[in-house]
From Swiss-Prot:
HAMAP family per UniProt: EF_G_EF_2_A
Record-listed Diphthamide modification sites: H603
Record has Electron transport as a keyword: no
Alphabetical list of PROSITE patterns matching this protein: G_TR_1 (PS00301), G_TR_2 (PS51722)
Listed name of the protein: Elongation factor 2
UniProt KW Transmembrane helix keyword: no
NCBIfam families the record matches: aEF-2, small_GTP
Family matches, as InterPro entries: EF-G-like_DII, EFG_II, EFG_III/V, EFG_V-like, G_TR_CS, P-loop_NTPase, Ribosomal_Su5_D2-typ_SF, Ribsml_uS5_D2-typ_fold_subgr
Alphabetical keyword list: Cytoplasm, Elongation factor, GTP-binding, Nucleotide-binding, Protein biosynthesis
Family, as annotated: Belongs to the TRAFAC class translation factor GTPase superfamily. Classic translation factor GTPase family. EF-G/EF-2 subfamily.
Length: 727
């Protein structure tokens, strides 16, 4: 039996021992060394050859990733590590650090219980470090810290032992500050990264060595020894004495929770059902014999097997051939194959039990974030939807060069939308174009070139990238009458800005898009009140949609309940296109204050009520001082001081705002905010301005009001592009 086959047998045995499982991720800012770390962990565990590790990037098994040298999708692998005389199963997920692929990070966080946060010793804590940490803590995923590229501090920056320790302390303090700020209340102190107990490791993933304080005490290696090994170019010897995989996986096993421990506090966070029900208790206990409950964290498309769903099981067991039920899409499915991940390969196993991460085929309608259960015991409600820190801010129009490819293109676009719920796909019925919205230029490029071009074999024409704008209101409208086409039904409404605290709760994912069939559910009402909505209004919310809300403030109108669903539909249609540039509306509250209906139901059907509400909502929004909002990005530039002026000039030329500046040694760090519309071509420009000597990164930071003097011009450009008549 080969080494790999033995590994598979061990994995099968350990899957049943909860206290010996760790579901963990590796996450970091782009290029801080996540994938190199993952590869060397695999090599140490005997999954790939040691000679190739670091160069092989086994988890970057997509051609596009290998070519760009960055991780685009989150990859999964299971491996075994021995610690304290016992073997442990480690299910490892490597996540992307590039801001355009943040959706994959969010989805991966749902699958794991602990994370190794990788931070480059040279660059320190960067924006994406903060973002991935925020996502981890939001999902109650416990972090430990690995400070990477320590050899560069010694060989390139020539730091003394005192300076080295100072640099480490600064990074640890910054990470701990973020944990204190963002961790759930009960873990703010417990989850701090403490050097002495070994929750922090230092090393070089590329050169395959790492140390931690407990390991130094055990092995007798000191900081001075490390400096000597690095200066004498003997990092190979250091890797034999302090192997990376041993130090990092020991830290993970000692400090990250097993599924049994983690599910006790994670389940109430991601599932809002009855904690006292059988399924509630079973998930908290991670019971393999309980009712089935799992969540799809990723869809991977395989040329031979079709769509493969990566799934974290919280309760129960899945065997090959089992009937399953998908709660979100309300579809039945069958588990055709049940496997574990081994990098790019999958190894079939007879069954998978609670607490593990597995690969399932046969779930054709599943999307990332989908809840999986048994058709005989349906999980109501499903798991909380995955909320992303970024939003799609750039749209391109694509058309198939050959019309015969059109059906295939539509199928591929559907598949992409299922795989990645940060992509929006829309079909413009009038022009026949397909619109794809993504997180940034790179995200869109990977979709059009790789997913459609390379994998789908379809040649497409891609339009110029278009920035996604939004509309909102700054005032309150007068009472507006919405009249049905037959003039027999009238609804009276007022548009006003949504309460700031309520909208902030919506953006943070504390309240969701939801239709309330009869009246607001008790859980929904409690969340709204907690977010700051008036208690009387919270009871009467009819629907929340795309960050807008409609509240029924009428009294004693009998027919209103019958017309409820039609009113909600009219409201949704009304906020899909704003009055300025037909962009989506956000942050609007519609108060329905009165209504009169025809007593005969035949005269108050969908063709009458929906348009009455739609026109009323649009009119109310138009009379409430509407404004355009544009997407913004936080831009961080790390540049030698000589080029600081050039970096600032580049920001200022793009309508940017400098928020903060710091000096660190001979480097300057510029923090700024720039509209997405002004960021095209920034990569080349900033490289040119600083002669390629700067590091920079961007992150979506929300929508802000377009300057008043630019609004008419931008609104006109959007209207002209959409073929709408000018205002």
């Amino acid at each position: 039996m080969g080494r790999r086959a033995k590994m598979v047998e061990k994995v099968k045995t350990l899957m049943e021992k909860h206290d010996q499982i760790r579901n963990m991720g590796i996450c970091a800012h782009i290029d801080h060394g996540k994938t190199t770390l993952s590869d060397n962990l695999l090599a140490g565990a005997g999954m790939i050859s040691k000679e190739l590790a670091g160069d092989q990037l086994a988890l970057d098994f997509d051609e596009e990733e290998a070519a760009r040298g960055i991780t685009i999708y989150a990859a999964n692998v299971s491996m075994v590590h021995e610690y304290g005389g016992k073997e442990y199963l480690i299910n490892l997920i490597d996540t992307p650090g590039h801001v355009d692929f943040g959706g994959d990070v969010t989805r991966a966080m749902r699958a794991i219980d602990g994370a190794v946060v990788v931070c480059c010793a040279v660059e320190g804590v960067m924006p994406q470090t903060e973002t991935v940490l925020r996502q981890a803590l939001k999902e109650k995923v416990k972090p430990v810290l690995f400070i990477n590229k320590v050899d560069r501090l010694i060989n390139e920056l020539k730091l003394t032992p005192e300076e080295l320790q100072g640099r480490f302390m600064k990074i640890i303090a910054e990470v701990n500050k973020l944990i204190e700020k963002m961790a759930p209340e009960e873990f703010k102190k417990e989850w701090l990264c403490d050097v002495v107990t070994g929750k922090v490791a230092f090393g070089s993933a590329y050169n395959n060595w790492a140390i931690s304080v407990p390991y130094m005490q055990r092995s007798g290696i000191s900081f001075k020894d490390i400096i000597d090994y690095c200066e004498q170019e003997k990092q190979g010897e250091l890797a034999d004495k302090a192997p990376l995989h041993e130090v990092i996986l020991d830290m993970a096993i000692k400090h990250l929770p097993n599924p049994l421990q983690a599910q006790k506090y994670r389940i109430p966070n991601i599932w809002k059902g009855d904690a006292e029900s059988e399924i509630g208790k079973s998930m908290v206990a991670c019971d393999p014999n309980g009712p089935l409950a799992g969540v799809v964290t990723k869809i991977i498309v395989d040329k031979h097997a079709g769509a493969i769903s990566a799934c974290r099981l919280f309760s129960g067991r899945i065997k090959q051939g089992d009937d399953l039920y998908l709660v979100g899409s309300k579809q039945k499915a069958r588990a055709q194959q049940v496997s574990i991940f081994m990098g790019a390969e999958r190894v079939q196993v007879p069954s998978i039990s609670a607490g593990n991460i597995c690969a399932l085929t046969g779930l054709r309608e599943a999307t990332a974030g989908e809840t999986v259960c048994s058709p005989s015991e349906i999980l109501e409600p499903g798991f909380e939807s995955l909320t992303h820190t970024s939003e799609p801010v750039i749209t391109v129009a694509i058309e198939a060069k050959n019309t015969k490819d059109l059906p295939k293109l539509i199928e591929i676009l559907r598949q992409i939308a299922r795989e990645d719920n940060t992509v929006r796909v829309e079909i413009n019925e009038e022009t026949g174009e397909h619109l794809i919205s993504g997180m940034g230029e790179l995200h869109i490029e990977v979709i059009t070139n790789t997913k459609i071009g390379r994998d789908g074999g379809i040649e497409v024409d891609v339009g110029e990238p278009i920035v996604v704008y939004r509309e909102t209101i700054t005032g309150t409208s007068p009472e507006i009458e919405g009249k049905s086409p037959n003039k027999h039904n009238k609804l009276y409404m007022i548009a006003e800005p949504m309460d700031e605290s309520v909208y902030a709760a919506y953006v943070e994912g504390k309240i969701h898009d939801e239709d309330y069939k009869k009246k607001t559910t008790a859980d929904g009402e409690a969340r709204l009140v907690e977010a700051g909505l008036d208690k009387d209004q919270a009871k009467k919310v009819m629907s929340i949609y795309n960050g807008n809300m409609i509240v029924n403030m009428t009294r004693g109108i009998v027919q209103l309940d019958e017309a409820r669903e039609l009113i909600i539909e009219g409201f949704k249609e009304g906020v899909r296109n704003g009055p300025l540039a037909a962009e989506k509306v956000q942050g609007v509250k519609i108060r329905l204050v009165d209504a009169t209906f025809h007593e005969d139901a035949i005269h108050r059907g969908p063709a009458q009520i929906i348009p009455a509400v739609r026109f009323g909502v649009r009119d109310a929004v138009a009379q409430a001082k509407p404004v355009l909002l544009e997407p913004m990005q936080s831009v961080y530039i790390n540049t030698p001081q000589d080029y600081m002026g050039d970096g600032m000039k580049e920001i200022n030329n793009r309508r940017g705002q400098i928020l903060d500046m710091e000096q660190e040694g001979d480097m300057s760090i510029i923090k700024s905010s720039v509209p997405v519309a002004e960021m095209f071509g920034f990569a080349g420009a900033i490289r040119g301005a600083t002669q390629g000597r700067c590091l920079w990164s961007v992150e979506f930071s929300g929508f802000e009001r377009v300057p008043a003097e630019l609004q008419p011009k931008i609104a006109k450009q959007i209207r002209d592009r959409k073929g709408l008549k000018s205002e």
